[in-house]
Curated annotation (Swiss-Prot):
One of its GO terms (cellular component) is chloroplast thylakoid membrane. Its main location: plastid. Belongs to the complex I subunit 2 family. It comes from Gossypium barbadense (Sea Island cotton). The keyword Signal does not apply. This is NAD(P)H-quinone oxidoreductase subunit 2 A, chloroplastic. It catalyses: a plastoquinone + NADH + (n+1) H(+)(in) = a plastoquinol + NAD(+) + n H(+)(out); a plastoquinone + NADPH + (n+1) H(+)(in) = a plastoquinol + NADP(+) + n H(+)(out). The gene is ndhB1. GO terms for molecular function: NADH dehydrogenase (ubiquinone) activity; quinone binding. Its EC number is 7.1.1.-. The lineage of its organism: Eukaryota, Viridiplantae, Streptophyta, Embryophyta, Tracheophyta.
Length: 510
């Protein structure tokens, strides 16, 4: 009898939960239409992979790419709509969130053609790779629109789990296994730290989880200047720091970059930073509104450490991927300047603009590394010597991307950094901007060192890898080269394009 009553209660509770979920999807589903397109693409990929043979591999690429492009289109059609909060306060839709979602989708769209030939040559499982990329993209998009503490925790976990699997995708590679282990352990530790910070925030606000309601709760409980908020700030900064990978939370970055498959590194190097930056702007700006001086100081310390350590250690690297890992640590220091400046003085607009340029610069560089690695089997910087004599197309594609990362005029990276530093200077961050300028000069040194190697014609400096290099034609239908050309063109955009990009970024501010 008791079992029968319990069974009936369970059925009733399950029915209520199902009906509530159906009601939310029915009335709020339109607010996550771009995400729904990706979910539909994931379902199609699973169905095709489980019911077809190897002959349908092109369909897998087509479906994944089409899903991403359609999701971007849905985002663009939704541009300039009124901000809306949906799913009982869990999700917020506005232009500011959507611009970050657009950047994540753009990264994923460019990474898929960049991965095609690599996957074929290394005989990696294609369907699973595409599933992990799309699922990570989905997690990043939900993180950009997250409006409560639970979603802010669950969404990056979705992204992180796929990242762990992607980084260890080449199971027979010892370096890949080592990188995955470090990534997984540090990721788990950082998630625990982040949740601990959320618990302090939850308790101090009187049990609120929505970001704006947390602010109201802190005012009602008079806890906005309490030690508990300071503890929450420290723990949350450390947790988010793992995703952004500034110093000293960068220990996992070089090993993961070196050990993971190169297309995976290209994907993780940009999407994780875009998603984490979107989350950081909302968490620091809203719940910690009353602690702005404290989190400004914390982020300034992280930015200074990142710019100095990242660029100085990059000079000593012999692996191209490790060099780019330390370079990315320095780059995130520049992005943090925009987060500190915030809404005032165009900080967020300059940060968004620089991240757009960083996507093109970084993915263009990684596309060149993928091609070089497939043709030579090496990642050593020294082995790039004399590449111009064998493959001028690849050498001349890599050079502008590296120069743009260094911030040399008239390339896109120069104007992106210029606007970012100018906004920081106007906000009074004189010391931070000065460090940024000095470290940018340091970064130019090690980028120019690589370009000098590329262009050398002296036989004694050319390694056997380049001597035996299989020369490619100037024009190719190769999907990696197509992705590379798009990124190189975007990296060399002159300053005349800055004003409309800045205007669009300014239009997204909440």
């Amino acid at each position: 009898m008791i079992w029968h009553v319990q069974n009936e209660n369970f059925i009733l509770d399950s029915t209520r939960i199902f009906m509530k979920a159906f009601h939310l999807l029915l009335f709020d589903g339109s607010f996550i239409f771009p995400e729904c397109i990706l979910i539909f693409g994931l379902i199609l990929l699973l169905m095709i992979d489980s019911t077809s043979d190897q002959k349908d591999i092109p369909w897998l690429y087509f479906i994944s790419s089409t899903s991403l492009v359609m999701s971007i289109t849905a985002l663009l059609f939704r541009w300039r709509e009124e901000p809306m909060i949906s799913f009982s306060g869990n999700f917020q839709t506005n232009n500011f969130n959507e611009i970050f979602q657009f950047l994540i989708l753009l990264c994923s769209t460019l990474c898929i053609p960049l991965s095609v030939e690599y996957i074929e040559c290394t005989e990696m499982a294609i369907a699973e790779f595409l599933l992990f990329v799309l699922t990570a993209t989905l997690g990043g998009m939900f993180l950009c629109g997250a409006n409560d503490l639970i979603t802010i925790f669950v969404a990056p976990e979705c992204f992180s789990l796929c990242s762990y699997l992607l980084s260890g995708y080449t199971k027979k590679d010892v370096r890949s296994n080592e990188a995955t282990t470090k990534y997984l352990l540090m990721g788990g530790a950082s998630s625990s730290i982040l949740v601990h910070g959320f618990s302090w925030l939850y308790g101090s606000s009187g049990g609120e989880i929505e970001l704006q309601e947390i602010v109201n709760g802190l005012i009602n409980t008079q806890m906005y200047n309490s030690p508990g908020i300071s503890i929450a700030l420290i723990f949350i900064t450390v947790g988010i720091g793992f995703k952004l990978s500034p110093a000293p939370s960068h220990q996992w970055t070089p090993d993961v970059y070196e050990g993971s498959p190169t297309p995976v590194v290209a994907f993780l190097s940009v999407t994780s930073k875009v998603a984490a930056s979107a989350s950081a702007t909302r968490i620091f700006d809203i719940p910690f509104y009353f602690s702005s001086n404290e989190w400004h100081l914390l982020l300034e310390i992280l930015a200074i450490l990142s710019m100095i350590l990242g660029n100085l250690i990059a000079i000593t690297q012999t692996s191209m991927k490790r060099m780019l890992a330390y370079s990315s640590i320095g780059q995130i220091g520049y992005v943090i300047i925009g987060i500190i400046v915030g809404n005032s003085n165009g900080g967020y607009a300059s940060m968004i603009t620089y991240m757009l340029f960083y996507i093109s610069m970084n993915l263009g560089t990684f596309a060149c590394i993928v091609l070089f690695g497939l043709r030579t089997g090496t990642d050593n910087i020294r082995d790039y010597a004399g590449l111009y004599t064998k493959d001028p197309f690849l050498a001349l594609s890599l050079a502008p991307c590296l120069l743009s990362l260094g911030g040399l005029p008239p390339l896109a990276g120069f104007f992106g950094k210029l606007h970012l530093f100018w906004c920081g200077w106007q906000a009074g961050l004189y010391f931070l901007v000065s460090i940024g300028l000095l470290t940018s000069v340091v970064s130019i040194y090690y980028y120019l060192k690589i370009i000098k190697l590329l262009m050398t014609g002296r036989n004694q400096e050319i390694t056997p890898h380049v001597r035996n290099y299989r020369r490619s034609p100037l024009r190719s239908n190769n999907s990696i080269e197509l992705s590379m050309i798009v990124c190189v063109i975007a990296s060399t955009i002159p300053g005349i394009s800055m004003n409309p990009i800045i205007a669009i970024a300014q239009d997204t501010l909440f």
